[in-house]
Structures are given as C-alpha cells and as structure tokens.
Amino acid sequence: FNKLNLPLIIIGDGPERLKLENISNSNIKFLKRISDRKVEEYMSRCKAFVYAGIEDFGIAPVEAMASGAPVIAYGKGGILDTVNCLNEQNNEKVKNGLLFKKQTSQDIFDTISWFEDKKLWKKFKPENLHEYSLKFSIEKFINKIDFSINKAWDKFNKKI
C-alpha cells in the first residue's frame, strides 16, 4: 500500500505492528483493538477487505462479506470455500471477491491495482455479499451438524 498510495486501515495488534508502522506511509492507519461494532462499521465502508493469510476457514472474510465488502485474498486454503473469484471462468457463481495466486507483495499490488483501475468495487453489490455470507451462519452450521449426526445415528440403528 506504500506503492499504491491508497488508504489502508489495519485493525488489530501483533508482534509486527511497530515494525509495520515504522515503514508505512501516511496513507496507512493502524487501529489497535476496537469493538466488534466498530470493525463492522469500517468493513461496511471499505472498498474491499484484503486478506493475505492462509487458514482452514477464515471467519474474517465472511464477516467482511456480511458487512457488504468484497474480499481480495490469497487463493489458498479455506478461502477457496468462501470466495468465488470475479473472472470470466465462473460466470455461474456468485462473485464476491478476487484471489491473488502468490503470497507476494507484487501479486497483492497487481490485484489491487486491477481492482482500482477497472473500478471493480462497483461490480459487487453489498446486499448480494451479505446474502452469500449467510451460507456460513451459525444456524446453517448447526443444521448441517444436526443433519450429519441424525444421518449417522440412523445408519448406526440400522446395523443393530
């Protein structure tokens, strides 16, 4: 974001924060710990949520979509279960973000530059992003677990 000269807000704290603050330009703002409500407020106002990590299932990108923000993320790990990339190959899918292929600053730069140059944020409708995020709600999770348990129980009972 130093090269992009676009505003970036980093929320949270960690061992690298001071180092990052020291090498960041004035377009980058750091917020330590803020309330969940404030996080939602920031997400609802941003052009995109950038997520460069790898997790089995990252909840933060889903929370960003719930707030109406598209996701720009590294295309590995659990993010592939939640983000459908905006491109020509998947016109049938709900598009809710962009994926970069390599976990490098250059790939992030290129993807965000494309997002900005083509004004891609205009292609994402906050209400569609929110609706898609509901696939990952607690209620849906409980229903799927309940269904799986009942199915296993029925299978077990048939063997007895």
Region annotations inferred by a language model:
Residues 1-22:
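Conserved catalytic-core segment of nucleotide-activated headgroup transferases in glycan assembly
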Residues 44-56, 69:
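Acidic donor-binding loop of glycosyltransferase active sites
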Residues 84-105, 113-120:
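Conserved acidic donor-binding segment of nucleotide-sugar-dependent glycosyltransferases
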